[in-house]
Amino acid sequence: ILIGLVGSEMCIRDRYKVKGIMYMIHSVALIIADFLFSKDAITEEEKEVCAYGMELIISGIISVALVLIIGLITGNIWYAVIYNMMMILIRTYTGGYHADTHAGCNVCYCGVYLISLLMLRIQVYIRETIIITWLIALTGYLIIVLNAPLEHHNKKLTIEQKEKYMIVSAVLGIASMLISFILNIIGVVTRYGKYSFLCQISLYINTMLLIIGLLLLLGVRKEGRFHEEDS
């Protein structure tokens, strides 16, 4: 019984911590919205929308900063930079899985980064890595092309936007693989056939394509459940 009570208390405490983080982000967003309103930059009707937008921006900045900090601590800062760039740039057009709370989003964002590093380490130690990594990249690219863009239930897209996002997603995927291919060649040539840091960057870019694709599939599944409950 005592263990159960302690466990319950810890769950309640964690819940309040999460609410505290969300409240802090919400409070800062409201302050910014009020400031913009006082400067006549937005109207009274736009304050709520502005505050929500600021919440998303602040939460996003926190996520990016946390990944960079983890990258510095673990000595993987370049991977952290690439992770942030690809997650922000490509997922802007593909869409994908999003947590229900800002705290959950931050945890997922950092967790996926750690998973990406683990996947990279596994590939580095596996033989025939070149074949595997390009299969990974191709799989991620096909998932993106076949499923992007994912329309969020709170953010509907017009037909023109869907077509634009689909094309941009495909182009960004091809560009990522092209950059990866070039880095791999340069890495091999500069090290006379031996594996180099540039080759690992190439591996990581391909890994991120698969991760973005898998997050897109998770988002498709989540949106599907939402529409089923809504109907």
Stretches with model-predicted labels:
Residues 1-14:
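Single conserved hydrophobic/aromatic residue that forms the stacking wall/gate
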Residues 44-56, 74-75, 97-106:
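Short, amphipathic, aromatic/basic-enriched membrane-interface segments that mark the entry/exit
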Residues 70-85, 131-136:
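Structural signature of hydrophobic alpha-helical transmembrane segments
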Residues 87-99, 145-154, 220:
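C-terminal ends of transmembrane helices
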Residues 100-111, 130-136, 159-163:
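Cytoplasmic-side transmembrane-helix entry/capping segments in multi-pass membrane proteins
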Residues 116-128, 171-190:
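Hydrophobic alpha-helical transmembrane segments in multi-pass integral membrane proteins
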Residues 127-140, 204-208:
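Alpha-helical transmembrane segments
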Residues 150-175:
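Membrane-helix boundary/juxtamembrane motif in polytopic membrane proteins
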